[in-house]
C-alpha cells in the first residue's frame, strides 16, 4: 500500500504518526471517491493498487499536512469485542448503530437496536454511494483478523469511525 515503500520510524515517534496520519487521509480520500457496492459500480481495484498510482499517492506525503479534496464525516459511536478460547475459536466483532439509537427500530423482545448505515448513501448520481435498490452503503465497520502463513494469530480491532483504519494500522505496527 501507500506505506509499503517507506521505511517506518518507531511507532510512537512524531515522524511515524505523521506518516500514518497522512497515509490514512490519502486512503480515505480514495475511499470516499471509489468505494461502493461492487454490484452497482465498477471499482478500478487494479489501478488503485498499482505501484505507479501508489507512488503518485506516496509522493503527496510531505512535511506539511495533506488536505484531502473530499469532505470528511463527523464522528459517531461503536463498540468492539475480540475473544478467543482454548480450542482456538476466535471472534472479531464490531457493532455500531452509527448515530444515536441507530434507525430507531428495535427487534421485538430483544432490545437490539438496528443500525442506520443507510445514512451513508448519497442522492448525488455521480457519487459512488448513490442510493439504489439493494445496494450496500460505504461504512467504517472493520473487524480485523490477523493471519500468518495461512494460520490464525488472532482477532483485533478498534472503535472510532474513520479512525479505525489508522487505529488498526497502529495496532499492527506494534505486533
Residue ranges and their predicted role:
Residues 159:
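Short acidic/histidine-rich active-site segments
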Amino acid at each position: 500500500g501507500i506505506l509499503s515503500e517507506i521505511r517506518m520510524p518507531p511507532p510512537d515517534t512524531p515522524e511515524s504518526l505523521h506518516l500514518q496520519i497522512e497515509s490514512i487521509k490519502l486512503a480515505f480520500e480514495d475511499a470516499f471517491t471509489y468505494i461502493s457496492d461492487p454490484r452497482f459500480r465498477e471499482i478500478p481495484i487494479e489501478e488503485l493498487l498499482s505501484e505507479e498510482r501508489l507512488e503518485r499517492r506516496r509522493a503527496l506525503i510531505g512535511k506539511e499536512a495533506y488536505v484531502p479534496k473530499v469532505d470528511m464525516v463527523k464522528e459517531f459511536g461503536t463498540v468492539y469485542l475480540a475473544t478467543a478460547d482454548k480450542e482456538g475459536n476466535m471472534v472479531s466483532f464490531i457493532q455500531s448503530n452509527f448515530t444515536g439509537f441507530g434507525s430507531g427500530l428495535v427487534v421485538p423482545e430483544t432490545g437490539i437496536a438496528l443500525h442506520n448505515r443507510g445514512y451513508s448513501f448519497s442522492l448525488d448520481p455521480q457519487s459512488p454511494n448513490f442510493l439504489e435498490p439493494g445496494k450496500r452503503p460505504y461504512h467504517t465497520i472493520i473487524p480485523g483478523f490477523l493471519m500468518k502463513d495461512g494460520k490464525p494469530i488472532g482477532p483485533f480491532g478498534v472503535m472510532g469511525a474513520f479512525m479505525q483504519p489508522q487505529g488498526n494500522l497502529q495496532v499492527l505496527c506494534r505486533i
